[in-house]
């Protein structure tokens, strides 16, 4: 004789648009983006961060300036500067921080990604 057991259903995943800040865009990164936008002379630009296949670890980060925000893009604003992320990339970037660092070896945008299981030495590719 078998018994039918009703299991509780899982709560639906939160909509990324409803999460306060699913991705952190640091003040240092926003300041550098503002400087670069001023050099371009186009106040409509935002920095887009995205994930694509490639690199030595399977996925790699990409950055580009973009004037167009898609309806389903996440927009994170810091100090009046906007960072855009598409939903596909966001699933790999939830909880990450986009920062800008300067050191003796150079200056660069850095992503600190808690979802990355491994990263390559240059920090521009990762695996999940």
From Swiss-Prot:
GO terms for molecular function: 2 iron, 2 sulfur cluster binding; 4 iron, 4 sulfur cluster binding; iron ion binding. Gene3D superfamilies: HesB-like domain. It comes from the Bacteria. GO terms for cellular component: cytosol. Binds 1 iron-sulfur cluster per subunit. Iron-sulfur cluster binds at residues 56, 120, 122. PROSITE patterns: HESB. Its cofactor is iron-sulfur cluster. GO terms for biological process: iron-sulfur cluster assembly. The keyword Iron-sulfur applies. Keywords: Iron, Iron-sulfur, Metal-binding. It holds the Pfam family Fe-S_biosyn. Required for insertion of 4Fe-4S clusters for at least IspG. HAMAP family: Fe_S_insert_ErpA. Belongs to the HesB/IscA family. Homodimer. This is Iron-sulfur cluster insertion protein ErpA.
């Amino acid at each position: 004789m078998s018994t039918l057991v009703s299991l509780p259903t899982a709560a639906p995943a939160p909509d990324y648009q409803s999460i306060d800040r699913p991705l952190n865009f640091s003040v240092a990164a926003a300041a550098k983006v503002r400087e670069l936008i001023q050099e371009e002379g186009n106040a409509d630009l935002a920095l887009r961060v995205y994930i694509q296949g490639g690199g030595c670890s399977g996925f790699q980060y990409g950055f580009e300036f973009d004037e167009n925000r898609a309806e389903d893009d996440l927009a994170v604003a810091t100090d009046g500067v906007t960072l855009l992320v598409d939903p596909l990339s966001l699933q790999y970037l939830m909880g990450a921080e986009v920062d800008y660092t300067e050191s003796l070896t150079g200056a660069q945008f850095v992503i600190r990604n808690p979802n990355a299981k491994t990263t390559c030495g240059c920090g521009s590719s990762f695996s999940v």
